[in-house]
């Protein structure tokens, strides 16, 4: 084993990491997440295996004992134990395609930390951070193309998201790099050209941060600058820095004070970014998901305070404490949108403390004299930590921000002096005959089962979804679905979800009855098989119930829907599904009763009113029907096809004609179409 070759392999892999944010492939399901995650994990597994071999022959490449190292190990151990003892250990380990986190990601972050903190010296770090800054500038250029309209903003709207697919993810990426650029601008302050390069880079990054319109990150930036400036007021090493810090404090006061004065002006209201700050008040907060999910998360922490629920299990807390007033928010939350609450839910107070210990260890190490940072550098890095900390109060982390955070941990760790964890030489024959084969075999197995097979599942799933939408490709779609389900455990929740969701177009296609029966049997077996491990997952029970209802197994559907209702009793969607089953069974009074329960959960929910009205029409309850019509706007009644269908099914043609005539009055542009419908009804 050649030490230099091994080191070069590791360096090559590490210097690819800054460019991972650019990776997006439409061949993958959740392309902005999975493309980056698979590439990163493959790189980490290769360089970690290489590093194991290097550490055997090079004592200098072995990790050194440090506060940060112990904090990282403690975090991994505590969260690993929490996942193992949590409500869904397999789910906690693998996560899903939408997030690509779970304990498997934490293990890779630990591997990344071990390698980069042991191998990089100060020169390597300088090159690596500057490579990352160069990559951030390329991303700035891409975002500029989005701003001027030459590139599409992936999430829609006006908030730029670059190649990360989410403006919040882009914001924290820019936030990190602003402070790193500031750090290097200070170090290179004597070189005019570099000072200008870093300065312009900071301005460009800050501009993109502004166009993300991410309040948490922007306020985090201001807060980070505030902390750095306050610290530098006591800077005895450089008078100029003290003066600049005072100027920054004055500028912040003027900025905040000035904004509060003009926040209601037409200029502010016309700005999509500034308006998000001016409209931030108690009423707007009450309409956000965080207003509801933060108290939910706290209740979940109190229920399992020591080691929590395990990663990826916030959904169990959500369903237990769901409030019916949340009907106008996204239907399912899998995060608390506060990283500290998320870790408290996932790992209990021990998990939260182990996560906070990472920040504490980082701060202590930065301010250690052995780290060799100047006072100004310490202040800048502390400002970065403060900015990131504040930002995380309102969001959850993603792979890119995790990598940047662990890079910072590794960088500071490499600056702190400490003795190597081991300096014992390893016998040559032991290295060649035992360690080398074991490392190669384990690396190959990991690459195959952790990356290759899940990637195959991911591609099979996206191919299945494309085939469903392509005429004549339904047979191919069914085969892709089967392959996606059987290939890998990672991504199976999404496979099951889309198996169920796409059953109707497959069953209504022109494939043979034998093929339909085969697909039905496969889908039903897959859904019911997974139900054993997801017995307490309300969303899965609802999905199974909906599938069984769609395919005509009404009694079995009610069993699953009753289970879902017991798990999340305040979710109106489940009541709607149950009522539809009762209507299909001809048990109209039961359907009306279920719809009434859904309506009474949140009388302000317009959809619940409409559904209750439909139930009353089917059940022939005219009093309830008239009561609900009085509570729904005319347009909502007139243009809802479900209401017309209910009247038509009950033979009430006069009401159907009346609604269609109202459509002619309210929508004269399509009057001819409505007249044709009237003719068909009155034949």
PLM-predicted stretches and their roles:
Residues 484, 529-530, 563-564, 597-598, ...:
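Canonical positions in the second alpha-helix
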Residues 259-272, 432-472, 490, 494-495:
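Hydrophobic alpha-helical transmembrane segments in integral membrane proteins
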Residues 159-160, 224-225, 240-243, 256-302, ...:
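Flexible juxtamembrane loops connecting transmembrane helices in multi-pass membrane enzymes
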Residues 116, 166, 282-283, 289-333, ...:
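TM-adjacent membrane-interface loops and short helices in multi-pass inner/ER membrane proteins
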Residues 550, 584-585, 618-619, 649, ...:
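Register position in tetratricopeptide repeats
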Residues 2-4, 8-27, 41-53, 72-86, ...:
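Alpha-helical transmembrane segments of multi-pass inner-membrane proteins
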Residues 449-470, 482-512, 533-550, 570-577, ...:
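Amphipathic alpha-helical repeat scaffolds of TPR domains
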